[in-house]
Amino acid sequence: MFTEYTGNRQFDLQLNRTFATILDRAGMETIAATTLPRLRTTSQITKLAQGLAERFSSEGDEDAAWRLHELAAFYLGADDPRKRRFIDAMSASFDEAHRSLALTRHAVPFGDGELTAMRWEADPTDRAQAPAGTPTTLIMMNGFDGYAEEIIDFASHFPTRPFDTIAFDGPGQGHTVLAGMPLEPPWERPTNAVLDYFGIESAAALGVSFGGYLVTRAAAYCPRISHVIAFDMMYRLLDGLTAPLPRPLRPIADAVVGNPRPAWLIDAALGTASRLSADLGWKLQQASHLTGLSRPSEVLRAFGDYTMEPLEGRITQPCLVFAGDADQYVPFERLGDVRRALENSASLDVRAFRHAQDPDMAQHCQIGDLDRAFAIMGDWLQAAPMKSLRNSIRG
């Protein structure tokens, strides 16, 4: 269930993302009812998450601790020494919490560095019972602000796991960007590096958040991807900056972000705006971290490369696309553009959710009901190989 704790959509998304799975712990209902609604600043969130992470770790509850360590790091800039300390603690707690599982860490050679990857072996019983044609490997792609640990943990929401699951931090993501490797547009390159490292000839691919765009880019140029899941859709990365604006203002904002000149004026305007909006301030901070660029005008130009427009007609795999009209990062009206970009897909299954009828599933990445979202994905992955109708559209 998605809970509006503070009334700040950005804060509420991150709080639901972290707290949804730990509300059953002692004292957490009280914190959710009395403490979370009073949060007003990113520093308050950091302080609360750090304190709770340390508490749960001292109690031996590492499954709760790693989630809270990640939240403690979330709003910190890359130059804050606490960020790396919290992320290291997150990784240590995650490994301790999952040491009984068939889950391993890997360093995938890429360029002059390495990509962080994690592999979770399929459940043998689930694999034996899966329909013929079910993918044997699922690649999970990170997004704008996650880490490989969180991405692979999403797989625990599948009702069954008949496939090996591999999550990775590509350039500009998670552990990889902390090591100094910035974001790059040709996402087929890190995807191919991961497939080569594990010796995989065919795999389904699932992109989370910004990964909903990245997975389509990879699929357009990587024929080893057999199935595509956009969880949820993302037609254009720049929409994340303009989506929160009132609809009449979006064309003006689009013109500015599409052509950020004069640079000095854009830099000054966004610098002022980011001080007035915690959401925009965080987005620009994170965007600078991902790209390695310091000026907002440079970031906007770089983000212009991340759009599905040039991919139109190139993606031929079966595709499953999620969309919600309460998504704070992706305008719902982009669904038509996404359909057009995927018009040559072997099949197109769109699951569109509206807040009035389905508020939990209408949020970004269906964060209000992950079990249901992953049940849909699991069913689709096991049924998609048997589809014969080209461009069958649902939703």
Task: State where each predicted segment sits.
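N-terminal cap/lid segment of alpha/beta-hydrolase-fold proteins
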Residues: 80, 84-130
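The serine-hydrolase catalytic nucleophile loop
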Residues: 144-156
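Alpha/beta-hydrolase active-site loop
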Residues: 150, 180-200
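Short alpha-helix in the alpha/beta-hydrolase fold that links the catalytic acid
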Residues: 154, 317, 331-341
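Conserved alpha/beta-hydrolase
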Residues: 158-175
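Short beta-strand/loop motif that positions the catalytic acidic residue
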Residues: 315, 321-323, 327
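Catalytic histidine neighborhood in serine/cysteine hydrolases
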Residues: 340-361
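Catalytic active-site module of serine/aspartate enzymes centered on a nucleophile-bearing elbow/loop
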Residues: 356-359, 363-395
